[in-house]
């Protein structure tokens, strides 16, 4: 019995550790998240747009920093201290979802940032058109371009990342990743 219990404890420990490796954040990030969620909990705001504006106001003093998601191996990066255009939108949208904990927030963020929620560099939604398409399929965003007067669709051809792998440390020297990016771009 003691052996079985020891194996179960070891299995739990290593499983937990493996999951923890795919998430990168600081204590400041989790505390900020909880502060935002607590504020929303005490709010009477039911309208999604008002909720997003309320969340976005928490980020007014945060600096713009590029490339905060880059690193090996690929992890779900939660950085609520520094943001770029896309990570700001992702953070606001994820915090505006019906989430009540840091774990809920990270799951919402993972779903927004990665194709089918798979945390891999080649499954990250690098292109904004791809991000809009994937999150539109899930009903999280809506492309209203066709509803705007005078708007015309533009042909879309994605190939920059697979054509310039030397510009991306995660692609440089990884032909299998470049091949996957080429598949993603062609889809």
Predicted features along the sequence, with ranges:
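Compositionally biased, low-structure terminal segments
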Residues: 13-15, 33, 161
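Cationic-aromatic interfacial patches
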Residues: 22-87
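Bacterial Sec-dependent N-terminal signal peptides
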Residues: 1-24
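Functionally constrained cores in energy, signaling, and assembly domains
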Residues: 7-10, 47, 96
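Acidic/His-rich structured neighborhood in mature extracellular/periplasmic domains
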Residues: 62-187
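Serine/threonine-rich low-complexity intrinsically disordered regions
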Residues: 1, 22-29, 101, 157
């Amino acid at each position: 019995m003691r052996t079985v219990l020891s194996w179960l404890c070891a299995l739990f420990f290593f499983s937990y550790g493996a999951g923890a490796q795919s998430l990168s954040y600081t204590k400041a990030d989790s505390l900020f998240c909880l502060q935002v969620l607590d504020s929303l909990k005490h709010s009477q705001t039911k309208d999604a747009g008002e909720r997003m504006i309320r969340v976005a106001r928490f980020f007014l003093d945060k600096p713009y920093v590029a490339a905060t998601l880059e690193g090996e191996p690929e992890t779900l990066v939660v950085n609520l201290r520094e943001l770029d255009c896309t990570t700001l939108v992702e953070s606001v949208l994820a915090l505006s979802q019906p989430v009540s904990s840091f774990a809920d927030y990270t799951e919402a963020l993972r779903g927004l940032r990665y194709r089918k929620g798979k945390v891999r560099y080649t499954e990250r939604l690098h292109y904004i058109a791809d991000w809009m398409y994937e999150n539109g399929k899930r009903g999280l965003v809506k492309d209203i371009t066709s509803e705007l007067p005078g708007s015309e669709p533009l042909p879309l051809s994605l190939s920059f990342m697979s054509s310039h792998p030397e510009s991306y440390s995660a692609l440089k020297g990884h032909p299998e990743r470049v091949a996957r990016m080429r598949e993603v771009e062609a889809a």
